[in-house]
């Protein structure tokens, strides 16, 4: 379902953010709205949170989709066209993980993570067709530092995030000659609901690995995304790390 919350001026650029209801996604929605964009907040299970984001942003709307289901991805793109009439920026932020060491990991757990990665690829493919009709667009993929460093108990997740950065590089080359820019932002450990639940000893070990000595804020990631979605006219195929110096690429 999609719902228009209000109307913006004619010709407003439209940004669609998957996983836009909480954490980094929420901050990205707010940052893009601050740049004058109309934002589509895409969620799967956090309807109340998605509506709270949209309610605070001019012209924002919400849409629900399980990206692991190709039929729902197709329905989402149709909804976006009906509600907004255009998409100028796609931020692939939705992420999913099931932590377990390899011998405890079930095939269903792996498939759930891989299914979301496939859905991100499929959504990107469908939105790209709209971009090509409009002769331009911006894609920003939210990957992760662990896609580069690895992390215990997160093999499917690290594979998915590393693959997302590989997709960024390959797709940027495929879009040669078109005004379609594709980049990744790879956050480190960011203060979100996910990291808030870490045990104190784990949090301490993480902070010891970060030269800046603290976790990042969602807004710090969102500002980089907003730059790539707006002013970055000569950046494509890049992975930009936002991790406090934990990893340099």
Regions found by a protein language model. Give the residues of each.
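Conserved glycine-rich cofactor-binding loop
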Residues: 21-22
């Amino acid at each position: 379902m999609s719902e228009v919350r209000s109307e913006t001026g004619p010709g407003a650029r439209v940004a669609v953010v998957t996983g836009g209801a909480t954490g980094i996604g929420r901050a990205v929605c707010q940052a893009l709205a601050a740049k004058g964009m109309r934002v589509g907040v895409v969620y799967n299970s956090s309807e109340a949170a998605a509506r709270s984001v949209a309610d605070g942003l001019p012209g924002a709307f919400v849409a629900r989709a399980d990206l692991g289901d190709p039929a729902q991805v197709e329905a989402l793109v149709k909804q976006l066209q009906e509600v907004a009439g255009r998409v100028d920026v796609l931020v692939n932020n939705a992420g999913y993980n099931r932590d377990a060491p390899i011998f405890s990991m079930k095939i269903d757990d792996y498939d759930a993570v891989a299914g979301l990665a496939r859905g991100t690829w499929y959504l990107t493919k469908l939105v790209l067709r709209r971009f090509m009709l409009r002769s331009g667009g911006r894609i920003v993929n939210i990957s992760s530092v662990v896609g580069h460093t690895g992390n215990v108990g997160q093999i499917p997740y690290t594979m998915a995030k590393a693959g997302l950065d590989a997709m960024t590089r390959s797709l940027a080359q495929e879009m040669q000659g078109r005004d379609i820019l594709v980049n990744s932002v790879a956050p480190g450990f960011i203060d979100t609901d996910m990291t808030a639940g870490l045990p104190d000893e784990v949090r301490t070990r993480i902070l010891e690995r970060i030269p800046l000595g603290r976790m990042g804020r969602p807004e710090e990631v969102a500002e980089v995304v907003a730059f790539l979605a707006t002013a970055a006219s000569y950046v494509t195929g890049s992975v930009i790390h936002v991790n406090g110096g934990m990893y340099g690429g």
